[in-house]
Amino acid sequence: MEGTKTADVNVGQEKASEKGESIHYIEFDKPYHFEGKEYRGVELEGAWELTTKEKISIDRMYERLKEERPANPILSTLYAVCVATHVTKLPLEFFYKMRASDFLKVETAVRRAFFMPD
């Protein structure tokens, strides 16, 4: 796409990771265009480094957005959106508009961060 900037979404990360360099980098099936930029993936390393205070902040974001409270919010898609938004510093809309197949990769990685730490 002409005139489109490319970002390998290291947004919100202190150090830039090259595509595939980090085990927590999620590569999309095909480039994703959002607000004039092209994204090839997202770095989710921050999900493995969350503090309790950050999780409380994510819980509060989730509470503002949810309509019903599932038995285990961590297993909901919306909670994964909230975590991904927090760790990447990308807006909610970035994840809302993403192809479902790509977001399933993100959602799976977020769940791994909680249930299968490094």
Where are these regions (language model features)?
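Short, surface-exposed, charged amphipathic helix/loop patches that serve as local interaction elements
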Residues: 2-118
